[in-house]
From Swiss-Prot:
The lineage of its organism: Viruses, Duplodnaviria, Heunggongvirae, Uroviricota, Caudoviricetes. One of its GO terms (biological process) is symbiont genome ejection through host cell envelope, contractile tail mechanism. The keyword Repeat does not apply. Binds 1 Ca(2+) cation per trimer. Ca(2+) plays an important role in interaction with the host cell membrane. GO terms for cellular component: host cell cytoplasm; virus tail, baseplate. GO terms for molecular function: metal ion binding. Homotrimer. Part of a complex composed of three DNA circularization protein N, three baseplate hub protein gp44 and three sub-complex wedge (made of two copies of each baseplate protein gp46, gp47 and gp48) that forms the baseplate. Residues 172-197 are annotated as: Disordered. The C-terminus is a needlelike shaped homotrimer consisting of an intertwined beta-sheet, a triple beta-helix and a metal-binding region. The keyword Membrane does not apply. This is Baseplate puncturing device gp45. Induction: Expressed in the late phase of the viral replicative cycle. Expression of late genes is activated by the viral late transcription activator C. Component of the baseplate that forms a central needlelike spike used to puncture the host cell membrane for tube insertion during virus entry. Probably involved in baseplate and tail assembly. Serves as the distal plug of tail tube channel and might regulate the process of the phage DNA and protein ejection into the host cell.
Length: 197
């Protein structure tokens, strides 16, 4: 068997190694186009190389729009730099740190987040929570605590007992079909009582 010298082997392997090196690249996100069916990125690669129309594939049911300056891992199909796909986009500037093993969640660069932790806890941290439901909403829990004021803008139906440890303020209360504001009854010395004062 004839021995291949090192320089001949290097000449054979160099083009192959170059293509392997071109298959994956680190990149910095410059521009995001979220108006298409598949999100497109313009990214800066190594050595001042820019790549437009890089498709960013996201898991079904999940979405995000990265900020300029986020980092990406680009896979180039067939080692062709014009066939890039962003397989991972991360932003170390805003990623929550010092989490516990097993924690998972969603975060936003402004600081609000949903965090799933051990012992079945879901912690939502934000300024405002808005829930829009076309039909109904059910909260099924043995106990609910509100630590601030609660405002109900429409009717309230209570099927269980109610306990109040402070005053109730209302223009009128209807109890057993009778108005506490306009209710009168016979007085103990004849006549009728006036409305409640």
């Amino acid at each position: 068997m004839e021995r291949v010298n090192d320089s001949a082997l290097n000449r054979l392997l160099t083009p192959l190694m170059r293509r392997v090196r071109l298959m994956l690249a680190r990149a910095v996100v410059n521009v995001i186009n979220d108006g298409r069916k598949v999100q497109n990125l313009q990214v800066g690669l190594l050595d001042d190389e820019e790549s437009d129309e890089v498709e960013r594939l996201q898991n079904y049911g999940h979405f995000s729009v990265p900020l300029p300056g986020a980092e990406a891992l680009i896979a180039c199909v067939g080692a062709q730099r014009d066939q890039g796909i962003a397989v991972v986009v991360e932003d170390r500037r805003y990623r929550p740190t010092n989490l516990e093993p097993g924690d998972a969640g969603i975060y936003h660069h402004e600081g609000h987040r949903i965090r799933l932790t051990k012992d079945g806890r879901c912690i939502i941290t934000c300024k405002t929570v808005e829930v829009y439901a076309d039909e109904s909403m059910t909260v099924d829990t043995p106990r609910t605590t509100f630590t601030g004021d609660v405002e109900i803008q429409k009717g309230l139906g209570v099927k269980g007992k109610s306990q109040f440890d402070s005053n109730i303020t209302a223009p009128d209360a209807i109890i057993n079909g009778k108005s506490t504001d306009k209710h009168i009854h016979r007085g103990d010395s004849g006549g009728t009582t006036g409305p409640m004062q």
